Regions:
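Beta-sheet entry/capping signal
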Residues: 35-38, 64-67, 214-219, 357-359
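Gly/Ser/Thr-rich loops at beta-strand to alpha-helix junctions
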Residues: 42-48, 220-228
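Generic recognition of flexible, low-complexity loop/linker segments
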Residues: 22-29, 55, 204-209, 215-216, ...
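Gly/Pro-rich turn-and-neighbor structural signature
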Residues: 1-30, 45, 148, 152-207, ...
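Catalytic or ion-translocation cores adjacent to nucleophile or general acid/base/metal-coordination motifs
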Residues: 57-106, 177-217, 224-305
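Generic beta-strand/beta-sheet core signal
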Residues: 42, 70, 221-222, 361-363
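N-terminal extension/subdomain marker
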Residues: 1-188
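Long, compositionally biased intrinsically disordered regions
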Residues: 305-363
């Protein structure tokens, strides 16, 4: 049996090398500057979307650990909770806070008022639920509404999710955030010193092999999963981020690499980043293969055609992957089915996770 396994492995290895060789020869002859470069986590779920994107245009994709080399503890803006966005074997060295990004005072006030309303209603509900005299009245009052919600969640999960999201946004508009990471002289536990920012920037760029040939637009893609009522949800998120979404880590590195002081220091270390190169962050949803581009206000002005085409191609790559995955799931309507799986609270395995990983290539 062991000899048969070894023979099967050898045959697979030879077949894989024959498949990869033409792609290696093609990549060695490419000299044209890429329109955009996208950096994904070295996760098996990133590979299909990387292949799909590279087929669609003058794009190049790269891989790196999803925490992008910076071990941080993040304080979330919305919940106020902290999370460690680094591998569990590492201790976070820095604390960064999420702050609203380019928000006017009216929108900020509306968000805070809505947040206060939701917090107050939550406290009232908890008081009524656990008070000695009121639980029965609470059930009689809200039971029918909760029953209706359960039926809708079971029969129309996508509609229920959209409605819930719309109501939440109406009460407290969702704000885009960015990490606040500059070193605080009054609180040395918060932020990252400029010298350390430079060191991390150099290390990450060299490790991912990106020291020349920079595109105008470089997207750092963290990743995470969407699932409902799943006790194993964190296992589907980014392992390099400690079972959290990797969006904040991507935003942090993008902001560091866009800093003039950091680029000047990198120049002295032999890494020249062109002035027309911009780094931006994104989040790859591994359940649906959608990619959300963060805070692209500036880049829309500088490269509107490039950004618009990238959005179109990312959507096409998503559809292509959904179709490929849907065939394996025997689904008649792959996109709708995969979207439903991410929102269905009865779905214990909304995505393929790390299954079907046959080989790991270090190059």
């Amino acid at each position: 049996v062991l000899e048969q396994l070894k023979e099967n492995e050898k045959n697979y290895e030879q077949t894989l090398l024959k498949t990869l060789l033409p792609a290696v020869k093609r990549s060695a002859t490419i000299t044209k500057r890429a329109d955009a470069q996208l950096v994904f986590c070295i996760d098996v779920r990133s590979e299909p979307i990387r292949r799909a994107i590279e087929r669609l245009g003058n794009y190049e994709t790269l891989g790196f650990a999803g925490f992008f080399g910076i071990p941080i503890r993040v304080q979330e803006f919305e919940s106020g909770k902290t999370k460690d966005c680094c591998p569990v074997l590492l201790k976070p060295r820095y604390r960064v806070d999420e702050k609203p990004y380019e928000v006017n005072s009216f929108l900020m006030e509306q968000h805070q008022q809505g947040k206060t309303i939701k917090t107050t209603l939550g406290k009232i509900y908890q008081e009524l639920k656990y008070n000695f005299a009121t639980p029965f009245a609470l059930v009689e009052t809200l039971g029918a509404w909760y029953g209706l919600k359960m039926v809708l969640q079971a029969l129309a999960p996508s509609y229920t999710k959209k409605t819930s999201h719309a109501l939440n946004h109406l009460i407290a508009p969702q704000l885009q955030t960015e990490p606040s990471f500059e070193l605080d002289e009054d609180n040395l536990e918060h932020g990252i010193a400029l010298s350390e920012q430079i060191d991390y920037a150099e290390t990450v760029l060299r490790l991912m092999g990106l020291t020349s040939g920079f595109a105008k637009l470089i997207i750092l893609c963290g990743h995470g999963s969407t699932t409902e009522n799943n006790p194993y949800a964190s296992a589907l998120d980014c392992g390099a981020c400690g079972g959290n979404h990797g969006g904040t880590n991507a935003k942090l590195l993008a902001r560091i690499l866009n800093k003039i002081d950091v680029r000047r220091a990198l120049e002295e270390k032999g890494i020249h980043i062109p002035m027309d190169t911009l780094f931006y962050a994104a989040l790859h949803n591994t359940t649906t293969d959608s990619i959300e581009l963060y805070n692209l206000n500036t880049v829309k002005v500088l490269y509107p055609n490039l950004v618009n085409q990238l959005r179109v191609d990312l959507e096409e790559a998503k559809s292509s992957n959904n179709l490929e995955r849907g065939q394996k799931l025997n689904s008649a309507h792959p996109e709708q089915d995969i979207q439903r799986r991410s929102q269905d609270w009865s779905e214990t395995r909304p995505e393929w996770g790390l299954a079907r990983n046959a080989a790991f290539i270090v190059a």
